[in-house]
Swiss-Prot record:
EC number(s) stated in the UniProt entry for this protein: 4.3.2.10, 3.5.1.2
Complex and partners: Heterodimer of HisH and HisF.
Protein name: Imidazole glycerol phosphate synthase subunit HisH
GO biological process: L-histidine biosynthetic process
Length: 217
């Protein structure tokens, strides 16, 4: 039985993610926790989050979880979701500049005002709703069994901009391309919400629960 720690640092609907993980694999032992010992003893770690980056980093610091997250990402299969993906980069331009965890080189940027769609219609910020995802590396194990150009559910005003294109595992468009997923080593992270993305999201979570990055990549 695989043990999965969902990191609780005071931000995000963690129980919906835990429920989706349990639905993806009924045999997984899923725990929502802020206990460093439990996190580091788990087989897999999920790092979710919604809200402001400044609050995210402050909450991690208050709970002394910054180094725990870094260590978990280096040692075991690690899934970042939404703000949890953005926090892996070096800096966010939110709130005039906020230092992030620095596990992936690059910055987090805000969608500019005045965006328009293909027909000239104004696009709202935040980017909210279903959008198509283009796999940069369709062979990655977390995309297994998910059709190309699948739709996933997004809610965000900021997006990750990795410096190295090799770190980008998927893109989406609003209206220009942005990183919808990143991958490096044992880390895979997504901007969308798999727990809200129906069959494709549940399949991604199931793939994560089976992923063995030490043997597959």
């Amino acid at each position: 039985m695989s043990s999965v720690a969902v990191i609780d640092y005071g931000m995000g609907n963690l129980h919906s993610i835990a429920k989706a993980l349990q639905h993806a694999d009924a045999n997984a032992a899923v725990t929502v926790t802020s206990d460093p010992d439990v996190i580091l003893a788990s087989d897999r770690v999920v790092f979710p989050g919604v809200g402001a980056m400044r609050d995210c980093m402050a909450h991690l610091a208050e709970r002394r979880l910054e180094q725990v997250v870094r260590r978990a990402a280096a040692e075991k299969p690690f899934l970042g979701i939404c703000l949890g993906m953005q926090a892996l980069l070096e800096e966010s331009e939110e709130n005039g500049g906020t230092r992030c965890l620095g596990l992936i080189t690059g910055r987090v940027l805000r969608f500019p005002e005045g965006l328009t769609g293909a027909a000239g219609e104004p696009l709202k910020i935040p980017h909210m709703g279903w959008n198509r995802v283009h796999f940069s590396d369709p062979s990655h194990p977390l995309w297994a069994g998910i059709p190309a150009e699948s739709w996933f559910y997004f809610v965000h005003s900021y997006y990750a901009a990795p410096a190295d294109p090799a770190d980008v595992a998927a893109t989406s468009d609003y209206p220009t391309p942005f990183a919808a997923a990143v991958a490096r080593g044992k880390v895979f992270a997504v901007q969308f919400h798999p727990e809200k993305s129906q069959a494709a999201g549940l399949r991604l979570l199931a793939n994560f629960l089976r992923w063995e990055p030490w043997s597959s990549r």
